[in-house]
UniProtKB/Swiss-Prot annotation:
It comes from Yersinia pseudotuberculosis serotype O:1b (strain IP 31758). This is Protein ApaG. Residues 1-125 form the ApaG domain. It holds the Pfam family DUF525. One of its GO terms (biological process) is error-free translesion synthesis.
């Protein structure tokens, strides 16, 4: 039996007030993702899929190769961290998705990106 690679994904988001224009329904958020390889062999992140939902229920799907122009190889016990951004029409929303990855044998697998919130500070309780 082939062991499924153990990958941990953590995300932190912040509101970027200096780039946002609330009166024009433009709310900019930055998020930092940390992908940790908790397994015993190398893995490589090849692609991403995001489902972005604003507080009106409008959903946008984003998919593509790699992240921030890279397809990082993550060694056992190591992590890859990057920061990216999203623009919403509402001050509150969520993101979730998955990464398309391969293990050291070239076997494809998906790693879930848990849902996280995008919110301006006044809406966080």
């Amino acid at each position: 039996m082939i062991e499924q690679p153990r990958i941990c994904v953590q995300v932190q988001s912040i509101y970027v007030e200096t780039q946002s224009i609330p009166e024009e329904e433009r709310f900019v958020f930055a998020y930092t993702v940390t992908v940790r390889n908790l397994g015993r062999s190398n893995v490589q992140l090849l692609g991403r899929y995001w489902l972005i939902t604003n507080s009106n229920g409008r959903q946008t799907e984003v998919q593509g190769e790699g992240v921030i122009g890279e397809q990082p190889l993550i060694l056992p016990g190591n992590e890859f961290q990057y920061t990216s951004g999203a623009v919403l029409e509402t001050p509150l929303g969520t993101m979730e998705g998955h990464y398309e990855m391969i293990d050291h044998l070239g076997q494809a697998f998906r790693t879930v990106i848990p849902v996280f919130r995008l919110a301006i500070p006044a809406l966080i309780h």
